[in-house]
Amino acid sequence: MKITYKTNVLDVIRLVENNTPALWEKEYNNFPNTWGGANALTKKVVKDLLVMINLPYSKELAGFIKYIVECPNTIRYSEYKRSLIGKTIEDVIFD
């Protein structure tokens, strides 16, 4: 699937949610078990996901991906995800 700014944002969320655990497990042992290590691991996973998505880098897109990686099982995230139904990446990132 080729991802563009016109792609439905829920497709990108699904891609991120499905690939995050594997990337996390792959990189987990390469970072120390500290807050700094956890932050570095999160940055590495977000960077790998951005490469996988293959859109031009933007701070907003990186922040969006980081939010999905850090908060996947919260009520607030579920409500946020529900509010994105029918929107494109362009709608979410540039609004």
Q: What are the residue ranges of the model-derived segments?
A:
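Short basic-aromatic helix/loop recognition motifs at nucleic-acid
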Residues: 35-37
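Amphipathic alpha-helical oligomerization segments
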Residues: 4-32, 51-79, 91
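Short, charge-rich amphipathic interface segments used for partner binding and complex assembly
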Residues: 39-49, 89
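Amphipathic alpha-helical binding modules
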Residues: 81-95
